[in-house]
Amino acid sequence: MEKKLIKIHRVTKVVKGGRIFSYTATSIVGNRKKNIGLGRGKSREVLESIKKSYLKAKKNILKLNFSKNIIPYFLFAKHCATKVFLYPANDIIGLIASKYVKQVLNIIGVFSVFSKIHGSTNAINVVICTIKALSLIKK
């Protein structure tokens, strides 16, 4: 299984005695054979939150249904204020996508897609939206 860390976010809680920091890590797990998992972990330590996110991603693995390394037709998904459009492309074109869409597509083994994002480009929302779009493929 291949692991990718998407984002680490630091959250500060202000209390009477000072500040309390906690960290949220978001990661994806896949095997380049149409399997992908998304996980988020929270902790007061960075490494612990990363470890938790990988464990949750391994538990949430989703199998996608398509044959080759190319998506068969146009896909669209919406999550919160993010809209992701995925268009099939030739092998010559390769991946034309944002950083986070590329990470998701690489980890499932798709290497020729053109994508467009409308609305919010928040990393976590883009990843969730891309996985939603890919899960809409019918066998």
Swiss-Prot record:
PROSITE patterns listed in its UniProt record: S5_DSRBD (PS50881)
One Gene Ontology term, aspect cellular component: ribosome
Ranges where the S5 DRBM domain occurs: 1-64
Record-linked InterPro entries: Ribosomal_Su5_D2-typ_SF, Ribosomal_uS5, Ribosomal_uS5_C, Ribosomal_uS5_N, Ribsml_uS5_D2-typ_fold_subgr
Cited Pfam families: Ribosomal_S5, Ribosomal_S5_C
Highest taxon listed in the record's lineage: Bacteria
GO annotation terms (biological process): translation
Keyword annotations of the record: Ribonucleoprotein, Ribosomal protein, RNA-binding, rRNA-binding
Role summary: With S4 and S12 plays an important role in translational accuracy.
PANTHER family: S5 DRBM DOMAIN-CONTAINING PROTEIN
Domain writeup: The N-terminal domain interacts with the head of the 30S subunit; the C-terminal domain interacts with the body and contacts protein S4. The interaction surface between S4 and S5 is involved in control of translational fidelity.
Oligomeric form and interacting partners: Part of the 30S ribosomal subunit. Contacts proteins S4 and S8.
The protein, known as: Small ribosomal subunit protein uS5
Organism: Carsonella ruddii (strain PV)
Gene expressing this chain: rpsE
